[in-house]
Regions:
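Short aromatic-enriched loop/helix-cap "lid" or pocket-rim segments at secondary-structure transitions
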Residues: 65-67, 95-97, 123-126, 147, ...
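Active-site beta-strand/loop signature of hydrolases that rely on acidic residues for catalysis
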Residues: 50-57, 70-96, 135, 170, ...
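Stable alpha-helical elements in mature extracytoplasmic
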Residues: 62-66, 99, 103, 113, ...
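Catalytic metal-binding/acid-base residues of hydrolase active sites
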Residues: 58, 88, 117-118, 185-187, ...
Length: 284
């Protein structure tokens, strides 16, 4: 995906003092693209079951370690499709690397990448791009970047950015049969209702762009049961294992995005709640 020189990035960012994110993004064609690379041949045989992994890559920092995990972890076999979030392209914090492309090259995957944010804080960033991706052992027929309704303006944040949450929607060719895959990143700095509105946008896009095709939805949905802007609630939940348990056992009560998907015929997996780690360990 073609970069934008830093002076132009800063000029576009300054427009956000007066204009909306949607208006400024409309001036940047990269936000409408889904960068797609189909360089891997289709596997010879179609398995009875596909292995699909959801993975927040945390900007692609510690990229080698994340790649080693994908390569060596026996619990994620077979691995056919990865719905990945938070992949940098040209950011100093991740070594200036195109992290999605490097992972695809390492594993011989096809991929589609959608731009979520252009980072403005570090003027030394070669590109400052940050986004989501669908990786696949199977050919990608078509791909789109689906922009989600804004629930938080990231320009007025310490992580000053142009952009907003998005999903990458791809049509895969599984031995001649189509399968849709969506890598979704819902907003953490909003409430459950805000995430529901964003999820419904993805559901409508899948219905419109991939009619009659089975679709797998995944990604960092940020279904945390709280509004990430509310520091008091975050501290209350962090200090109460009992409250954490109640929230985990009834996520759909707080997160309407999940029943919204079920209402459209999707099955939520896993059905049993499980604790996941929100941030990486210091060694990646």
């Amino acid at each position: 995906m073609r970069g934008i020189p830093n002076p132009e990035r800063q000029r576009l960012g300054a427009l956000l003092e007066q204009e909306t994110q949607e208006t400024v993004m409309a001036k940047i064609p990269q936000f409408a693209e889904a960068e797609t690379e189909n360089w891997a041949p289709a596997p010879a045989a179609v398995p009875e079951q596909l292995g699909i992994l959801v993975f927040n890559m945390e900007r692609g920092v510690h990229l080698e370690e994340r790649g080693d995990f994908l390569q060596d972890c026996p619990d994620i076999r077979p691995l056919d499709v990865v719905l990945a979030n938070e992949l940098d392209d040209g950011c100093v914090r991740s070594g200036g690397r195109n992290t999605a492309r490097e992972l695809a090259e390492r594993f011989g995957w096809n991929y589609a990448y959608g731009l979520e944010f252009i980072e403005l804080v570090n003027g030394a960033d070669p590109k400052g791009f940050h986004g989501n991706a669908v990786f696949s052992r199977w050919p990608i027929r078509r791909a789109w970047t689906v922009r989600l309704p804004e629930q938080y303006n990231w320009y007025f944040d310490r992580q000053r950015r142009i952009g907003g949450r998005c999903a990458v929607l791809a049509e895969l060719d599984i031995g001649g049969r189509p399968l849709g895959g969506a890598s979704i990143h819902l907003e953490n700095r909003t409430h459950g209702e805000g995430r529901r509105l964003q999820m419904e946008t993805v559901l409508q896009a899948a219905e419109r762009l991939l009619p009659g095709i089975p679709v797998v939805l995944g990604g960092d949905l940020n279904t945390n049961t709280f509004d990430g802007r509310d520091k008091d609630v975050i501290q209350e939940i962090a200090g109460s294992p009992e409250l954490q348990r109640r929230c985990l056992e009834d996520v759909a009560r707080y997160e309407a995005a999940l029943p919204a998907a079920e209402d459209m015929g999707y099955c939520v997996v896993p059905r049993e709640p499980a604790v996941t780690r929100r941030k990486p360990l210091p060694d990646g």
